A protein has these predicted regions:
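Catalytic Walker B motif of ABC-type/P-loop ATPase nucleotide-binding domains
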Residues: 94-97
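ABC ATPase "signature
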Residues: 154-155, 163
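Short helical segment in ABC ATPase nucleotide-binding domains corresponding to the A-loop/adjacent helical element
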Residues: 30-38, 48, 52
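Conserved ABC ATPase signature
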Residues: 68-73, 77
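Conserved catalytic motifs of ABC-family nucleotide-binding domains
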Residues: 90
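Conserved ABC ATPase "signature" region
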Residues: 45-64, 117
Length: 184
């Protein structure tokens, strides 16, 4: 029951990834990743090891990237740093709010694949918010479709595709299929 948990403690147990990365522009990649572990009182050696481990996880060489600043990174690199910053303190829950919405399609597909790999290997719960149905179907073990604040369907991707529960879900999937056939 989360209502019994101190709100600050609760928030520190959630990793957040947002659309525009939210990286601190005046801090290096290493310091951005180290923020929450430092707040939690981790020692310097543990933080440094975790920063390097996480950069390796997303294929960013620590020797090359730890001292760079966000402005020196591509959009995809910034998203990778934003993702590992959220993972830095090993939260049980990850909240990802349209993290891949502002990057090109090739980088987006690559990041989606990386996220799937990380999710499979982490054992953590990921809540991923997106307006892209294809992305939801690719990344979700369960997909929640909401229209005007009302739940339309909550199901595994295969079930959602096979048995849309409402006219809205049917139309949403049909629009997505039309876009996919058109190459968009």
């Amino acid at each position: 029951d989360v209502s019994t948990i101190d709100p600050v403690t609760l928030r520190r147990g959630i990793g957040y990834v947002i659309q525009q990365t939210g990286l601190f522009p005046h801090m290096s990649v290493a310091k951005n990743i180290a923020c929450v572990p430092a707040i939690l009182g981790w020692d310097r050696d543990r933080i440094d090891a975790r920063v390097d481990e996480l950069l390796d996880l997303v294929h960013l060489d620590p020797a090359v990237f730890r001292d760079r600043y966000p402005a020196q990174l591509s959009g995809g690199q910034q998203q990778r740093v934003g993702l590992v910053r959220a993972l830095a303190a090993s939260p049980d829950l990850m909240l990802l709010d349209e993290p891949f919405g502002a990057i090109d399609a090739i980088t987006r597909a690559s990041l989606q694949d990386e996220l799937l790999r990380i999710h499979r290997n982490s054992g953590k719960t990921f809540i991923f918010v997106t307006h892209d149905v294809t992305e939801a179907l690719k990344l979700g073990t369960k997909v929640l479709v909401i229209d005007e604040g009302r739940i339309q369907q909550y199901a595994e991707p295969d079930e959602l595709l096979a048995r849309p529960a409402t006219p809205f879900v049917r139309e949403l999937l049909a629009c997505q299929a039309t876009r996919a056939m058109a190459g968009g």
